[in-house]
């Protein structure tokens, strides 16, 4: 299991990213706008750099809901491959069964 501090850090990053999402998108549109002047672009770049690092959504890590494991994460289930397999073997995930051919 992942440390509680690692899980809490990811939750904090998600909150910060959602808080600054609109501001980041507005600055990104100015930066990528071909009609914007160089001064406007440069100001937008500087403002974007002033935002907290955790405001970037790429700093978030997909983690298993149950264990907090960061690797082997399956987006469809929101869990790690290990927990998906355990729950599938117990029949706790409807419609999921072991493959056999």
UniProtKB/Swiss-Prot annotation:
Highest taxon listed in the record's lineage: Bacteria
Name by which UniProt lists this protein: Small ribosomal subunit protein uS14
Stored PROSITE patterns: RIBOSOMAL_S14
NCBIfam families: PRK08881.1 (NF006477)
Gene that specifies this protein: rpsN
GO BP field: translation
Subunit structure: Part of the 30S ribosomal subunit. Contacts proteins S3 and S10.
Pfam families attached to this UniProt entry: Ribosomal_S14 (PF00253)
Keywords noted in UniProt: Ribonucleoprotein, Ribosomal protein, RNA-binding, rRNA-binding
Function comment: Binds 16S rRNA, required for the assembly of 30S particles and may also be responsible for determining the conformation of the 16S rRNA at the A site.
GO MF entries: rRNA binding; structural constituent of ribosome
Species annotation: Idiomarina loihiensis (strain ATCC BAA-735 / DSM 15497 / L2-TR)
GO cellular component: cytoplasm; small ribosomal subunit
Family statement drawn from the similarity comment of this UniProt entry: Belongs to the universal ribosomal protein uS14 family.
